């Protein structure tokens, strides 16, 4: 949680079925992604999909680290 920006960061899992991408066409939006949520109402403020149409089980559920460098806020996965 970032109290200055009032955002909750959430990592999401890979789509299913994992290795058969033919059955789920497209990028499979919000899977294998970092999602920034408004904590008051759950609205998605932004997202970044690390692996669109993930067929390699590269989900994004590991811990995220929020830090500042050079005056910028950064999020490392």
Regions from the PLM with identified roles:
Residues 21-60, 67-72:
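Extracytoplasmic/lumenal domain signature
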Residues 13:
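Short loop/turn segments immediately following the C-termini of beta-strands
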Residues 4-6, 72-73:
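Short coil/turn segments that connect the beta-strands within blades of beta-propeller domains
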Residues 5, 9, 45:
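Active-site-proximal flexible loops/turns
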């Amino acid at each position: 949680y970032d109290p200055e920006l009032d955002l909750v960061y959430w990592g999401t899992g890979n789509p299913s079925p994992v290795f058969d991408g033919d059955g789920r066409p497209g990028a499979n939006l919000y899977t294998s992604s970092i999602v920034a949520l408004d904590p008051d109402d759950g609205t998605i403020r932004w997202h970044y999909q690390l692996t669109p149409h993930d067929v390699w089980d590269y989900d994004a559920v590991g811990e995220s680290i929020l830090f500042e460098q050079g005056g910028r806020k950064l999020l490392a996965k």
